[in-house]
């Protein structure tokens, strides 16, 4: 599975890589704290919370709030 296109897609929704890392880390932490279920790939491999969070950002399911 090539992760590069997923990251490029997520970068279209944020200003820069650092903001993406920060947002993905916060979302992954929230997923761990709430005990959210892990997604499983078609091959039966469970995805890590960090990959799930980047995927959610890339698909526009996660709202990123910015301090102005």
Curated annotation (Swiss-Prot):
UniProt keywords, alphabetically: DNA-directed RNA polymerase, Nucleotidyltransferase, Transcription, Transferase
A single GO molecular function term of this UniProt record: DNA binding
Catalytic activity: RNA(n) + a ribonucleoside 5'-triphosphate = RNA(n+1) + diphosphate
InterPro entries: DNA-dir_RNA_pol_omega, Pol_omega/Rpo6/RPB6, RPB6/omega-like_sf
Gene3D superfamilies: 3.90.940.10
EC number, as in UniProt: 2.7.7.6
GO biological process, one term: DNA-templated transcription
Signal sequence annotation: none
Gene Ontology cellular-component annotations: DNA-directed RNA polymerase complex
Protein's UniProt keywords contain Transferase: yes
Protein purpose: Promotes RNA polymerase assembly. Latches the N- and C-terminal regions of the beta' subunit thereby facilitating its interaction with the beta and alpha subunits.
Record note on quaternary structure: The RNAP catalytic core consists of 2 alpha, 1 beta, 1 beta' and 1 omega subunit. When a sigma factor is associated with the core the holoenzyme is formed, which can initiate transcription.
Family, as annotated: Belongs to the RNA polymerase subunit omega family.
Annotated protein name in UniProt: DNA-directed RNA polymerase subunit omega
The organism's taxonomic lineage, starting at the top: Bacteria, Pseudomonadati, Aquificota, Aquificia, Aquificales
């Amino acid at each position: 599975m090539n992760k590069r296109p997923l990251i490029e897609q997520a970068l279209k929704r944020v200003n820069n890589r650092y903001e993406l890392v920060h947002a993905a880390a916060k979302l992954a932490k929230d997923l761990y704290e709430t005990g959210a279920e892990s997604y499983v790939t078609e091959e039966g491999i469970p995805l890590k919370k960090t990959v799930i969070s980047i995927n959610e950002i890339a698909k526009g399911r996660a709202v990123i709030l910015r301090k102005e």
